[in-house]
Design a protein with these regions (language model features):
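Conserved, well-structured ligand/cofactor-binding cores
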Residues: 1-467
């Protein structure tokens, strides 16, 4: 064991631990979610990138000796390589606006830098977590900047997975292009369409979300490095904000910009609110699609049964032979969680006071969780459901021609009153719309067949003068 001290006194730290006393206190204070920082390595790596950029800027300004800078930069590089993930053990939800997370990073980097300099862990007179690793910084600029970088990177993975799901939907749209089915509004028979049109609509609605996610993720490119505590830049040199932002842009390969007003930027969480809203919107659309898949596959004998979902597992402990739509159900539940996370982000953002929002840890946790869950859910939906969907083509077609909704297609040719009468008679007698129209002599068979041609019913067509 080694002894470390802080404002509150001394504590024993395991000799082999790279974290220090402030991390230890955070572990003891915040046993909240059981979800530790190492489960979101993207935030760890972003923090190390921030510390690298700060060290470079401080070296450039003559505030950090080159030997110390080199040790800190190498330690950060090892953190980014994932060598110390297990040392990042603070809870994702914590008081202090992210100070515990920031200090966890400062201590790990400082202790590794000490080893590289030939010193023992805890010999902070040679490389100090606050005086050197956190030089010219505050949690209030370093932490939100790291969160933004990590979320921006996470958005790339999210949209990449979304692209794959869109492609899978579009492939099914082509596969099912010739399958006629009944469209429905308010769960009642409406007018015919193709099953391919159904899946193409899914592809298009999801495609819209790529642009919206990317637009809102771009808000993360404005950062407040150099703001330090509240945005006034106390304890940083003139020009530091510009230097550290330039270095961080180079390190991350991202075009970051310094906020025009650092006081405003330090207290504002609007970018998180906007991005969370776009993530929620994607979740809502995915859930609606999964509702449709469950409904269209209902049955197999007493439901709609237009499509078959791949059977994944036995569905009941009491009903033999039952197979449930477990993959869409899981995606529905993911969407519910993401929608709840969006509300958390909204409430936490609203609760900010004066010059700082102290609730950024739960905002970050919610958004990282939403990104990860949606990535996993979309991959699961694509691989274990959508790609294996098959159609019951004959059943789909039979339902169209047995549906009273078919009367809408002949409405322009026979008139609304006659069409209404046909619908009422079909409902009362059980006869088909097709047979009743021929029986009443309203149209010739040739004309009726032309109107009820799948191409005519599923796309706009030229109407005759009498129509």
């Amino acid at each position: 064991m080694r002894i470390e001290h802080d404002l509150l006194g001394e504590r024993e730290i395991p000799e082999d631990a790279y974290y220090g006393i402030q991390t230890l206190r955070a572990i003891e204070n915040f046993s909240i979610t059981g979800i530790k920082l190492f489960l979101y390595p993207q935030l760890i790596y972003a923090l190390a990138q921030v510390k690298t950029a700060a060290a470079r800027a401080n070296r450039d300004m003559g505030l950090l000796p080159d030997t110390l800078y080199q040790a800190i930069e190498k330690a950060c590089a090892e953190v980014i390589a994932g060598k110390f993930n297990g040392e990042f053990i603070v809870d994702m939800v914590q008081g202090g606006a992210g100070t515990s997370t920031n200090m966890n990073a400062n201590e790990v980097i400082a202790n590794r830098a000490l080893e590289l300099l030939g010193h023992k862990k805890g010999e902070y007179s040679y490389c100090h977590p606050n005086n050197h690793v956190n030089l010219s910084q505050s949690t209030n600029d370093a932490y939100p900047t790291a969160v933004k970088i990590a979320l921006h990177d996470g958005n790339k993975k999210l949209t990449a997975e979304l692209e794959k799901l869109i492609q899978a939907m579009r492939k099914k749209a082509h596969e099912f292009a010739g399958i006629l089915k009944m469209g429905r509004t308010q769960l009642q028979d409406a007018v015919p369409m193709t099953l391919g049109q159904t899946f193409e609509a899914y592809a298009v609605t999801l495609e819209e979300e790529i642009q919206r996610l990317n637009e809102n993720a771009c808000l993360f490119l404005e950062i407040n490095m150099g703001a330090t505590a509240i945005g006034t830049g106390i304890n940083s040199e003139p020009g530091y904000a510009e230097k550290v932002t330039a270095h961080l842009s180079e390190i991350t390969g991202t075009s970051l910009v310094s906020a025009p007003n650092l006081i405003e930027a330090t207290q504002d969480t609007g970018s998180f609110v906007m991005y969370s809203s776009s993530v929620k919107r994607l979740a809502v659309k995915l859930s609606k699609i999964c509702n449709d898949l469950r409904l269209l596959s209902s049955g197999p004998r007493c439901g709609i049964n237009e499509i078959n979902l791949p059977p994944m597992q036995p569905g009941s402990s009491i009903m033999p032979g039952k197979v449930n739509p477990v993959i869409p159900e899981a995606v529905n539940q993911t969407a519910f969680k993401v929608i709840g996370n969006d509300l958390t982000v909204t409430l936490a953002s609203e609760a900010g006071q004066l010059e700082l929002n102290v609730f950024e840890p739960v905002i970050a946790f919610s958004l990282f969780q939403s990104q990860d869950m949606l990535c996993n859910a979309m991959a699961t939906l694509r691989k274990r459901c959508v790609e294996g969907i098959t159609a019951n083509a004959e059943h789909c077609r039979n339902m169209v021609y047995n549906s009273i909704g078919l009367v809408t297609a002949v409405n322009p040719a026979i008139g609304y009153e006659a069409a209404t009468d046909i619908a009422k008679t079909a409902l009362k007698t059980g006869k088909s719309v097709y047979d009743l129209i021929l029986e009443k002599g309203l149209l010739t068979k040739e004309r009726l067949d032309d109107i009820l041609n799948p191409e005519s019913m599923t796309h706009p067509r030229k109407l005759t003068a009498t129509e």
